[in-house]
Amino acid sequence: MAREAKGPKEGDFITIKSYKHDGSLHRTWRDTMVLKTSENVLIGCNDHTLVTEDDGRRWVTREPAIVYFHKHYWFNIVAMIRDNGVSYYCNLASPYVLDKEALKYIDYDLDVKVFPDGERRLLDVDEYEEHGAQWRYSADTDRILKANVKVLVDWIKNKKGPFSQDYIDIWYSRYQELSRRQ
């Protein structure tokens, strides 16, 4: 008897769904190309990907972006490849789960934006505090998220993983190679 595939393979397209802590759907990305999967990591690429907001508004991403998700870290990383360099949008979020429908995670509002010149900004602190009170984030969740902000800032400072230009070059090149095969 043939073994059932364990999830998406390199070159497959998946949907990504982010939810809020209360379980409501926040945002959906259609057709993210999978570049790599391992036990704990999924790397993909969005390129002119359709995004649907919770209110039904739709828009298309403007540039290619390498996306990084991990099953143990409470953040995911979007590296947007632009003419003036790579910009990063890092979501503080639950580790992802992957099922037949989509890659899914809970978005916890806090974001770190990194500009091509290295400037960093922590965004949406007010939204995090508002939702934390509204949905009663536990003390453990708050502690874990704040600890993961520190991990994320350390990765940024040390150009670890997605924050390395070599990493971006390797995975964007792989995306281009797989796109030519489609």
Swiss-Prot record:
Superkingdom: Bacteria
Active site: R27 (proton donor)
Pfam families: DUF402
InterPro entries (UniProt xref): DUF402 (IPR007295), FomD-like_sf (IPR035930), Ntdp-like (IPR050212), SA1684 (IPR016882)
Reactions the enzyme catalyzes: a ribonucleoside 5'-triphosphate + H2O = a ribonucleoside 5'-diphosphate + phosphate + H(+); a ribonucleoside 5'-diphosphate + H2O = a ribonucleoside 5'-phosphate + phosphate + H(+)
Cofactor(s) of this protein: Mg(2+)
UniProt keyword annotations, A-Z: Hydrolase, Magnesium, Metal-binding
Name this protein carries in UniProt: Nucleoside triphosphate/diphosphate phosphatase
